[in-house]
């Protein structure tokens, strides 16, 4: 007994002096993390308290949102930072950056009939321009897609294959004075041009139904369009929050993230307060355990304006530092009211878009989580249009979960997941109604447990996980530019 007490005293003394790496106080006496134990620490009351806190940050300011650089988002960043710092378990930092904020509104009419349009962020302004409408072939991604008489006209373009910014640029190169992009799936269309570009023309988004109707009208006669776009621009200082466990192997980092900002229209509690609080809840639960591999949590800023925060972070890492990140997990909208359990298609089997080596294994891990509980799931297109984009471009394996946005649920999906057919996964997507009341408690609880399941697995061991290649390409078939699922973090950001 005496020798055991002496050993204990030496261990405590050594830890208190900070000799054992960066490990937090009490680390040797914590149990090793397991999937079951970490999942059991996840409580719905903690999750809901978190999303209610984010709602309060939005409610506290006249803007009623948490858009990057605004007061609601500043409160969000400070709270996340302070909550993690207080655990003593993490090294926490705020990564400062400056990005251009843009807010735009559009009004559109065709042959005197008003249409419901959304201006693309970073669109050039348009002061009630009036012109004949022409239709681009294919998806408007190439110069040959534009009619010879495009000059001086407004051009109608179908969504898909290339980014909104590229479509706007191609329209500008063809001498169009405006562009209208319509959806290739049911529902309205909102998005961003990704930044300012002198090639861009005033650009608005339109629903699939309205876009098809306009194309039919052009085919049978002349259509005159009036377009008005009001755009505001402002440089804003903002921050990512990065928290890495003090313990664990820092040369084998398991990384996961969620964007912490909202759109201008509302508080963004599902998009993406759900993902932000999901990983926050897991981060707090993880403090009860020790682990073998370091875990790094990230809350990204300015995702809604073109993945700006995550791109800034990845660009700040040289190859040596990024190689320490063995995989990246992304969680964007995990509490949709009319949800479906969707897993990024890392192996490309559903959409012919593969992630870097290891992405398939991440997909299989999440499939196992649902399968073990007898729960249905489906793939969602792994297009690289969320905060994992910058990671896969540098060959970091990636994956994650998503419960749906503006795309409507089918009768077949209702048989799997319940809910209501013909209604969007999240009817309040990118709207003022995206509040705490918009959250499906069952979905957010289940998906947060899935986050815990994956973190525990990889924090314990990366044995058998594929070695990352030095170079790699993701196979992309343009026919799959039409994506089910939709939403922030999938295909509305750019395409």
From Swiss-Prot:
Subcellular location, principal: secreted
Localization in the cell: Secreted
GO function term, MF aspect, one: metalloexopeptidase activity
SUPFAM superfamilies for the chain: PA domain (SSF52025), Zn-dependent exopeptidases (SSF53187)
Gene Ontology annotations for the cellular component aspect, listed alphabetically: extracellular region
InterPro entries for this protein: M28_fam, M28_SGAP-like, PA_dom_sf, PA_domain, Peptidase_M28
Residue ranges of every copy of the PA domain listed in the record: 124-218
Residues that hold Zn(2+) 2 according to the record: 271, 304, 430
Glycosylation sites: 142, 235, 272, 352
Site positions for Transition state stabilizer: 429
Keyword annotations: Aminopeptidase, Glycoprotein, Hydrolase, Metal-binding, Metalloprotease, Protease, Secreted, Signal, Virulence, Zinc
Binding site for Zn(2+) 1: 259, 271, 332
Residues of the active site: 303 (proton acceptor)
EC number(s) on file: 3.4.11.-
GO-annotated biological processes: proteolysis
EC top class, as a word: hydrolase
Cofactor(s) listed: Zn(2+)
Signal peptide: 1-21
UniProt keyword annotation of Metal-binding present: yes
Family membership noted in the UniProt record: Belongs to the peptidase M28 family. M28A subfamily.
Subunit structure: Monomer.
Protein role: Extracellular aminopeptidase that releases a wide variety of amino acids from natural peptides and contributes to pathogenicity.
Protein's recorded name: Leucine aminopeptidase 2
Species: Trichophyton equinum (Horse ringworm fungus)
Encoding gene, per UniProt annotation: LAP2
